[in-house]
């Protein structure tokens, strides 16, 4: 199993649009794909720290992640996501 983790901030002034995205195009963006085992979403408790949001996606394999990232529907949703967020970083994690 692997964990794909990404961290980001919402672009100032785009919070309402981001919340709308989560209820529409971004809703269940990960869980609808085969190979996804769990999704965890976090918001920082420390005001002013960056990044403010963290998402962790557990997948059964790297192949599943690659398949999801190459899906046209996912790519379209990801493009919209990136128009609403900044300071995006990601990691691929395995347990030790």
Model-based region annotation:
Residues 23, 63, 93-94:
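Compositionally biased amphipathic helical and low-complexity segments enriched in hydrophobic
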Residues 37-54, 77-96:
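Glycine-rich beta-strand-turn "strand-cap" elements at beta-sheet edges
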Residues 2-9, 40-72:
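Short, well-ordered beta-strand segments in beta-rich or mixed alpha/beta enzyme
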Residues 14-41, 73-81:
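Short amphipathic alpha-helical segments
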Residues 1-2, 96:
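Absolute protein N-terminus
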